[in-house]
Amino acid sequence: MQCHRDLALSQALWGWQLSKQSGWAHPSLPHSPLPSTVHSCSWAPPHLQRHLPLATVSPGTTQLTQGPAGRTLGQTQASCPEPRPSMDAVDATMEKLRAQCLSRGASGIQGLARFFRQLDRDGSRSLDADEFRQGLAKLGLVLDQAEAEGVCRKWDRNGSGTLDLEEFLRALRPPMSQAREAVIAAAFAKLDRSGDGVVTVDDLRGVYSGRAHPKVRSGEWTEDEVLRRFLDNFDSSEKDGQVTLAEFQDYYSGVSASMNTDEEFVAMMTSAWQL
């Protein structure tokens, strides 16, 4: 019986059924490589530029360098790191996990993060290698013992022999430019009126707009359908109806990976959250 409950929990939390399509902020776009260089973020709306790092909004001073798997890392020209000659074993493991998550949609990273936070029943925000590997297996992601131990060692911040869950989840998110991180933070700040770092599904419902969603424009979905599909990512009988900044970032990191340019991503966020 416990096995069945665990399986149902993992399926519900993961939300990775191939037949399910998520809503807005989850556009069905191909994972195409990003342009290797963008020289200015001056396209950002003026009222959002105050949320962006100065280096990002100063025309001609920022270069977005292409990161792993075609995604971008925000770097200023003066501090662009030299490319590493090869990927170490742990980085290769992380890239494998990230790719498997993203292959299952924009909510893939968020689903994995939510599952592991639920698995952390004692609230320690840590997992040992066996717990980590078994949790991945329940989600259909397989690592051998050496790979799991390598990941745990890399994110063992206190020498306890366990993986720091939040550090691992942050590292798993697809890299984003500073412009994308800033507009995500601006959207969450608008929702988080109390400043306690938590918003409710009702908060999302009260602000979110799907009118610019491509499937609304094409007539395939109504605005209500888009809203329902989006909220399903955060609200169900297995979820608590509350959304933290980390969960919001988890979700939008997956969305970001499917959008070609910073301009496109910022425009989507501006429309969806009426920034």
Curated annotation (Swiss-Prot):
<feature type="binding site">
    <location>
        <position position="162"/>
    </location>
    <ligand>
        <name>Ca(2+) 2</name>
    </ligand>
</feature>
<feature type="binding site">
    <location>
        <position position="156"/>
    </location>
    <ligand>
        <name>Ca(2+) 2</name>
    </ligand>
</feature>
<feature type="domain" description="EF-hand 4">
    <location>
        <begin position="222"/>
        <end position="258"/>
    </location>
</feature>
<keyword id="KW-0479">Metal-binding</keyword>
<protein>
    <recommendedName>
        <fullName>Calcyphosin</fullName>
    </recommendedName>
</protein>
<feature type="domain" description="EF-hand 2">
    <location>
        <begin position="143"/>
        <end position="178"/>
    </location>
</feature>
<dbReference type="InterPro" id="IPR018247">
    <property type="entry name" value="EF_Hand_1_Ca_BS"/>
</dbReference>
<feature type="binding site">
    <location>
        <position position="203"/>
    </location>
    <ligand>
        <name>Ca(2+) 3</name>
    </ligand>
</feature>
<feature type="binding site">
    <location>
        <position position="126"/>
    </location>
    <ligand>
        <name>Ca(2+) 1</name>
    </ligand>
</feature>
<feature type="binding site">
    <location>
        <position position="194"/>
    </location>
    <ligand>
        <name>Ca(2+) 3</name>
    </ligand>
</feature>
<dbReference type="GO" id="GO:0005509">
    <property type="term" value="F:calcium ion binding"/>
</dbReference>
<dbReference type="GO" id="GO:0031982">
    <property type="term" value="C:vesicle"/>
</dbReference>
<feature type="region of interest" description="Disordered">
    <location>
        <begin position="59"/>
        <end position="87"/>
    </location>
</feature>
<comment type="subunit">
    <text>Monomer. Does not form oligomers in the presence of calcium.</text>
</comment>
<dbReference type="InterPro" id="IPR011992">
    <property type="entry name" value="EF-hand-dom_pair"/>
</dbReference>
<feature type="binding site">
    <location>
        <position position="167"/>
    </location>
    <ligand>
        <name>Ca(2+) 2</name>
    </ligand>
</feature>
<dbReference type="GO" id="GO:0005886">
    <property type="term" value="C:plasma membrane"/>
</dbReference>
<keyword id="KW-0106">Calcium</keyword>
<dbReference type="GO" id="GO:0035556">
    <property type="term" value="P:intracellular signal transduction"/>
</dbReference>
<feature type="domain" description="EF-hand 3">
    <location>
        <begin position="179"/>
        <end position="214"/>
    </location>
</feature>
<dbReference type="InterPro" id="IPR002048">
    <property type="entry name" value="EF_hand_dom"/>
</dbReference>
<keyword id="KW-0963">Cytoplasm</keyword>
<feature type="binding site">
    <location>
        <position position="196"/>
    </location>
    <ligand>
        <name>Ca(2+) 3</name>
    </ligand>
</feature>
<feature type="binding site">
    <location>
        <position position="160"/>
    </location>
    <ligand>
        <name>Ca(2+) 2</name>
    </ligand>
</feature>
<feature type="binding site">
    <location>
        <position position="122"/>
    </location>
    <ligand>
        <name>Ca(2+) 1</name>
    </ligand>
</feature>
<dbReference type="GO" id="GO:0005654">
    <property type="term" value="C:nucleoplasm"/>
</dbReference>
<dbReference type="Pfam" id="PF13499">
    <property type="entry name" value="EF-hand_7"/>
</dbReference>
<feature type="binding site">
    <location>
        <position position="124"/>
    </location>
    <ligand>
        <name>Ca(2+) 1</name>
    </ligand>
</feature>
<keyword id="KW-0677">Repeat</keyword>
<feature type="binding site">
    <location>
        <position position="192"/>
    </location>
    <ligand>
        <name>Ca(2+) 3</name>
    </ligand>
</feature>
<feature type="modified residue" description="Phosphoserine; by PKA">
    <location>
        <position position="126"/>
    </location>
</feature>
<keyword id="KW-0597">Phosphoprotein</keyword>
<feature type="binding site">
    <location>
        <position position="131"/>
    </location>
    <ligand>
        <name>Ca(2+) 1</name>
    </ligand>
</feature>
<dbReference type="InterPro" id="IPR051581">
    <property type="entry name" value="Ca-bind_SignalingProt"/>
</dbReference>
<comment type="function">
    <text>Calcium-binding protein. May play a role in cellular signaling events (Potential).</text>
</comment>
<dbReference type="GO" id="GO:0005829">
    <property type="term" value="C:cytosol"/>
</dbReference>
<feature type="binding site">
    <location>
        <position position="158"/>
    </location>
    <ligand>
        <name>Ca(2+) 2</name>
    </ligand>
</feature>
<feature type="binding site">
    <location>
        <position position="120"/>
    </location>
    <ligand>
        <name>Ca(2+) 1</name>
    </ligand>
</feature>
<feature type="domain" description="EF-hand 1">
    <location>
        <begin position="107"/>
        <end position="142"/>
    </location>
</feature>
